[in-house]
Amino acid sequence: MKEIVIGIFAAFFFGFTFIFNHSMELDGGSWLWSASLRYFFMVPFLIAIVWMRGGFKRLTEEVTRAPRLWLRWSFVGFVLFYAPLTFAAASGPGWLVSGTWQFTIVAGVLLAPLFLASSGIRHKVPLTSLAISGIILVGIVLIQIPQANSASLQMVMLGILPVIIAAFAYPLGNRKMMDVCGGRLDTFERVLGMTIASMPAWIIMDIWAVVTVGLPSSSQVFQSLLVAISSGVIATTLFFIATDRARHNQGKLAAVEATQSTEVLFVIVGEMLLLGVVMPTSLALVGVGIIIIGMLLHSYHTMIATKKMHLTIPN
């Protein structure tokens, strides 16, 4: 249950990504800067945290042990996650992006066969977790229906396809890096290592931005800083703490990743308060209720599975 609570707190801070990205898009800011600035701003905060915790030596040893793996899975987990997400925010409405992002719930469950258990056998797709994730996804679809009716097909596709890529990339990169680190690094060290390893891609993106759209506005820089603190540092760290704690149980791990569905609730409220977005329709509110039910079912399933596991462990 602790992992579920941590995941929900992470979702709250992740929600600011969609709100501020929507705000920057409305102000005319480029998605290229919105994506790269977040990770540049994350570096000094993470360096300070890791330095105070004395983790630089461990991090350096891990990165030098497998630099190609760090570059590869950091690119997948951070670049292929956040660049498509910010592109979608510039191409579609915020509700569509935050709603479609919840596909990561199902993606996280479907990725299980790509990983080996401690016994060397590949994990199976946890069917109960998949079924519960499907319930949450139904709620997400209901939230989208009223708004999708008023959006063009091109806007819908530009808002959906990049986010589906991000929905698979984020849990895949996260889990692969957990395998690479093998529990030898704490969450802050792993996030810093992945952030630094993804820097070449962000630098290339910055060069592209300077050539095509010029420098970012002061408003976009400030909002990107807020995204870096709330989503990049606080939310990412909380989420990785939760997934680290659950990484040996695919059902529990899927439940933690499913907590990200609550982002939709936080984004709806946040956009209403900060951006003046109208209140969702009754059908959308039904979808919100289904999401909450799905979350409760995930939490209950996790609690029961944990109790059974403890009962089967000999004293």
Q: What are these language model-derived features?
A:
Residues 39, 119, 253-315:
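C-terminal-most transmembrane helix of multi-pass membrane proteins
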